[in-house]
C-alpha cells in the first residue's frame, strides 16, 4: 500500500511540475504597455504618456522556520535595460523647466528592488491621477 501511495505521489508531482513549467499560472516578469501621468506644479496641464514598464510574476521562496534563520531576499520585477524619453509640458510659468522624463522598459528581470531608482510599493489605488486638468488627445511614445 505504501508503495502505491508513493507511486501516486510521484506521478502527481512529476505531472504537476511539468505542466507548471510549460504554462505559468501568472504572467512572468516582462515589459508591458502602460499609461503614466506627466505634470509639474508650475505647469497648468497634465499629459498622459504611453510607455512600457516592467510588470509580472517573479518566483520567490519563504523559509518554513523563519525564527531560526534569516529571511530570504525577495525579488521583484524590475528594469534590466531602460531608456528615458522626455516630453515638454505646454504653458509652464517662466523660469520653470517644462521637460518631464519618463522610463521606457526595454527588458525586465527579477531582482532586488532598489528604492533609489524604483517604486518598490504595491499596487496603487489610482495609478493615473492628475492634479491639473488633463490635456485631451495628446499621447506620446
Swiss-Prot record:
Provide the GO biological process annotations: G protein-coupled receptor signaling pathway
- Gene3D superfamilies attached here? Cystine-knot cytokines
Q: GO MF annotations for this entry?
A: hormone activity
According to the UniProt entry, the coiled-coil residues are none
Record's signal peptide: 1-20
Disulfide partners? 29-77, 43-92, 46-130, 54-108, 58-110, 113-120
Give its localization. Answer: Secreted
Subunit structure of this chain's protein: Heterodimer of a common alpha chain and a unique beta chain which confers biological specificity to thyrotropin, lutropin, follitropin and gonadotropin.
What function does the entry list? Promotes spermatogenesis and ovulation by stimulating the testes and ovaries to synthesize steroids.
Q: What is this protein called?
A: Lutropin subunit beta
This protein's encoding gene: LHB
Amino acid at each position: 500500500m505504501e508503495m502505491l501511495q508513493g507511486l501516486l505521489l510521484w506521478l502527481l508531482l512529476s505531472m504537476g511540475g511539468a505542466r507548471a513549467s510549460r504554462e505559468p499560472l501568472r504572467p512572468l516578469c516582462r515589459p508591458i504597455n502602460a499609461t503614466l501621468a506627466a505634470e509639474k506644479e508650475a505647469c497648468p496641464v497634465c499629459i498622459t504618456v504611453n510607455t512600457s514598464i516592467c510588470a509580472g510574476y517573479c518566483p520567490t521562496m519563504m523559509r518554513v522556520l523563519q525564527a531560526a534563520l534569516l529571511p530570504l531576499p525577495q525579488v521583484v520585477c524590475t528594469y534590466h535595460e531602460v531608456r528615458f524619453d522626455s516630453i515638454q509640458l505646454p504653458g509652464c510659468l517662466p523660469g520653470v523647466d517644462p521637460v518631464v522624463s519618463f522610463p521606457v522598459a526595454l527588458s525586465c528581470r527579477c531582482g532586488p528592488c532598489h528604492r533609489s531608482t524604483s517604486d518598490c510599493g504595491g499596487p496603487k489605488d489610482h495609478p493615473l491621477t492628475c492634479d491639473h486638468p488633463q490635456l485631451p488627445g495628446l499621447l506620446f511614445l
